[in-house]
Amino acid sequence: MVNLDKGLLKIIKDESLEDYFIKANFGLEKENVRVTESGNLALTPHPKAFGDREKNAYIKTDFSESQLEMVTPVCNTLEEVYSFICNLNKVVSLEIMKNGEFLWPQSNPPILPREEEIPIAKLSNREDELYRENLSYKYGKKKQVISGIHYNFSFKEEFIKLLYKELKVEKDFREFKDDIYLRMARNFQKYHWLLIYLTGASPVFHESYIEEIKEEGEKLGEDSYYIKDDTSLRNSSYGYKNKKDYYVSYNSIEEYASDIKNLVKDKEIQSIKEYYNPIRLKSLGSEDMLESLLHKGIDYLEVRLLDLDPLSIQGVSKETLYLLHLFMIYTLLKENKEITYKDQEEFFKNHDMVALKGRNEEAVIYENGVPVLLKDKGREILSEMDEIVEILFSNNEEFKNVIKRALEKINNPHDTISEKLIKDIKEEGYINFHMRLAKEYLNNFKNKEFNLVGYEDLELSTQILILDAIKRGIEFNIMDRLENFISLSDGEKVEYVKQATKTSKDSYITALIMENKLVTKDILRENNIRVPKGKDYDNIDEAKKDFRLFKDEKIVIKPKSTNFGLGISIFPGEYSREDYDKAVEIAFREDSSILIEEFMTGKEYRFLVIGEEVVGILHREPANVIGNGESTIEELVSEKNKDPLRGKGYKTPLEKIKLGEIEEMFLKNQGLSFKSIPKNGEKIYLRENSNISTGGDSIDFTDKIHPSYKEVALKSAKAVKALICGVDMVIDNIEEEAKEKNHGIIELNFNPAIHIHCFPYKGENRKAGEKILDLLFN
């Protein structure tokens, strides 16, 4: 604890500020170039599906048209920011795959064409394009397409205010806050070489990279080179660095701004954007960063040294994120000293040495001009971090694991990311290795396409809508997780959405009409749309008494005002008084009023209407199993429910099949039970109603059905003035034109699920989430 600030550490401990200290704001900005299947830089334009890159909040371009930049919002936890970068990676990967492209998982470039063929990003602001053109003249395009990750960090304001109160300093709050971040930035500059060693992941480069650098390196395989003992080419003089090491003071904001302004005035750099220091001071809400810093102060720190980690599917591991968090805490608790020009010279020297020679067993770093073995100094820093954790965060397993893993890498360079990459690339080849990973990661995303990572508790339709919003750069906010209530903003207006399809576009009365099946039928009938005949009841005894009216009819018994097929019983054939009474009781469990109506012949189809369009049409096949001649129905259901597409609570494309009263009664009417053993290949239905919510299968019929039925669906939606609704229609023959007696509307749904149209059991994704966004924002 020799060089830790014992006074500050004591105050945080004595005043029980640990819980405030560990809370922070986190953000990530991640770059990847797009590549073809052969590992060549993709020369295609930025995908149109991502909309205007300058307005998209999450998906932009960096230097090159081929270089994507993914930006998370400010997140409250590392788990949250990690989940968000997972979702961005998935959204981007699944979109560019349509053009046969992949995200290149390495900071160093793939197979590059000639300099002049690398496309600069096409932007609306000519100054932004000119800035990039000047970079290409100065550094070369091949260096500019090196990619990496920026890690944005700030403490919660409440922690800084509590610390300000406890320390009783004689300065105003803004100055105190700025001093905290300046202190951290200075210590970061001094010790960041350790992060390069621990996270460096760009030791090898392709033969198509810069010719002069190849001459400095050694051949590793048929298509690649490396600098012996290097950890991060990107952080070295051969990578993404300024031409010179510029001295910029971090002793005050005024000195910081003045030094950078002088670099611009002397034409050393074009603007602060070209100041490629491993850490930069950042202020919110202004185009002119330096003026904003001077007038508003520091809001957060931007860490710029992270390589893409090819061994992590997201390009960065949780371990690295927790390491950085602990390191930022460490920089505040280290001694508070101003740094001189001579200090910075030493920091630059250590930076370059670790980037190019860090894996050498005898590697040294310099401290006050004295060489010290890297491994010895690394252990000392990690020991201090361990003391901090033991004093303040003794129950934090993530921090403890980070220190343990870091020590392993310090003690054995073979455990570093860079060493592992060299070994794997030597065995497989530079392009083959990275393309294998790129394809593996894409397949992983494809297998979990419908999930919004970190938000799996939301209904699947809501998850899909948010994923589509992310693709367009429409910002979202979860307002009530249990209710699936979100807000969406495109920067110009805000839309509130509940359960994916309840929006401002439909009035309250429209929802009430569709909620009430009796009123819905009356309105449709008034508009000359065929609906089933029947009666409504609000008294269970009256309903049971009328058994004699229906006993020879095919009927449906259902609640008047429920969704998702709850409480519905269907009798297409003979049924007993006991079965009838039980169905009436089941319906009354779900509502105070029920309907008993004729059962219409034909197959049932769900039409999804959004705006003036029928977006998708599904036939929902009732819950069923296919026999194998050995297993019981109960066992077959259990096996079918193991499908990863099946789950509970509308969080997967298909719902698990239930074995309840309704299923038992339906099987009984077929002379079967849960213990019956169907023949090999025999299909057994467990329900008459075909809702996905009760275990049904979804089969897309959008392009197979006669267009006249789409007109009927649109007419039905217009009759109740609905812009979003599900129309349940029974049709005798889908190839035959709609006529008076060959179809009928059995229900309108005011909150239709969209996931069944996006991930049908059979058929194509109808992009219902995108259609909702079109309705809300176009």
From Swiss-Prot:
Q: Under the GO molecular function aspect, what terms does this record hold?
A: ATP binding; glutamate-cysteine ligase activity; glutathione synthase activity; metal ion binding
- UniProt binding sites for Mn(2+) 2: 747, 749
InterPro entries attached to this UniProt entry: ATP-grasp, ATP_grasp_subdomain_1, Gln_synth/guanido_kin_cat_dom, Glu_cys_ligase, Glut_biosynth, Glut_cys_ligase, GshAB_ATP-grasp
Q: What is its EC number?
A: 6.3.2.2, 6.3.2.3
Q: Which cofactor does it need?
A: Mg(2+); Mn(2+)
Q: Pathway, per UniProt?
A: Sulfur metabolism; glutathione biosynthesis; glutathione from L-cysteine and L-glutamate: step 1/2; Sulfur metabolism; glutathione biosynthesis; glutathione from L-cysteine and L-glutamate: step 2/2
Q: Which reaction does it catalyse?
A: L-cysteine + L-glutamate + ATP = gamma-L-glutamyl-L-cysteine + ADP + phosphate + H(+); gamma-L-glutamyl-L-cysteine + glycine + ATP = glutathione + ADP + phosphate + H(+)
> Which residues participate in Mn(2+) 1 binding?
728, 747
Give an example GO cellular component term for this record: cytosol
Claim: Metal-binding is one of the keywords in the record:
yes
Q: Region Glutamate--cysteine ligase: which residues?
A: 1-354
Domain annotation ATP-grasp: ranges: 521-777
Q: How is the cofactor bound?
A: Binds 2 magnesium or manganese ions per subunit.
Specify which residues bind Mg(2+) 1 according to the UniProt entry for this protein: 728, 747
UniProt similarity note: In the N-terminal section; belongs to the glutamate--cysteine ligase type 1 family. Type 2 subfamily.
Cite the record's note on assembly: Monomer.
What does the record give as the function of this protein? Synthesizes glutathione from L-glutamate and L-cysteine via gamma-L-glutamyl-L-cysteine.
Q: What is this protein called?
A: Glutathione biosynthesis bifunctional protein GshAB
Organism this protein belongs to:
Clostridium perfringens (strain 13 / Type A)
